[in-house]
Amino acid sequence: GPIDLDKISSVDEISFLKKLFPIYKTIKNVKKNPLVKNKDLIGFVGAPWTLLVYMINKSSPKKKLIKNFFGDNYLIKKILKILEKFLKIHIENQIKNGATIIQIFDSWAGLLDKKDLPNYVYTPTLNLVNHVKSLKIPVICFPREIKDYKSFCEIVKPDAINIDYNIDPKIIAKQIKIPIQGGLDPKVLLSDKYTLKKKALNYLDIFKNHPYVFNLGHGVLPETNPMM
């Protein structure tokens, strides 16, 4: 349905924080656990663009629906700025409660054409990255399926980049100088252990001369065997 800009603009910080309080409480409790002593704890936020996509379409987003929304460029930019404001508060509160790294997920960056990336992905994410850096905290970005990770890193300047499984890791290893995370296709976890080991070792070999955090290129699929 239509998005009520006045309703979004009138949301006060107290109401916003009340809904997120369980997250901050969980972060604080995790930090108290002796097992995480001297270890980093990653706080997570969705990027403004991805949050907007879910506001337009709550289920799995359809590119056609998003395209229909592009007609009102003013509305999009206005909502992104409002989301950016509240995300900065959310980031600050995660850090206050113990997060030592922030990761920004832009799960639907890949929906956009190249010409739309500067306004809807690069600029809003850069503003968040600069805010996190001003708090002296490292920041990881995950612009899923953006294809041009090199340009993203040059413009947004995260401390590390999370890659998806649709990009060739060999190209990334040549193009990107900052630490890299992820890349493994979650579907590999649905295969046998031999295939999983082979794929994992391939990533480790490709990034053997590069700062690399082994991880999936997106979330664990619901049907994945936890014992895999």
What are these regions (language model features)?
Residues 1-16, 45, 99-118, 217, ...:
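Glycine-rich, proline-tolerant flexible connector loops at the mouths of alpha/beta enzymes
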Residues 47-50, 67, 106-110, 115, ...:
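Flexible, active-site-adjacent loop/turn segments at secondary-structure boundaries
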Residues 130-228:
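Catalytic-face loop-and-helix region of soluble metabolic enzyme cores
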Residues 57-104, 114-138, 150-159, 204-208:
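Alpha/beta enzyme core
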Residues 8-39, 114-139, 174-178:
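Alpha-helix-loop-beta-strand connector modules within alpha/beta enzyme cores
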Residues 41-44, 97-106, 138-143, 212-216:
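Short beta-strand segments at enzyme active-site cores
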Residues 1-93:
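Active-site-proximal, glycine-rich beta->alpha crossover segments in alpha/beta enzymes
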Residues 19-22, 26, 30, 79, ...:
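General structural feature for long, well-ordered alpha-helical segments within catalytic domains
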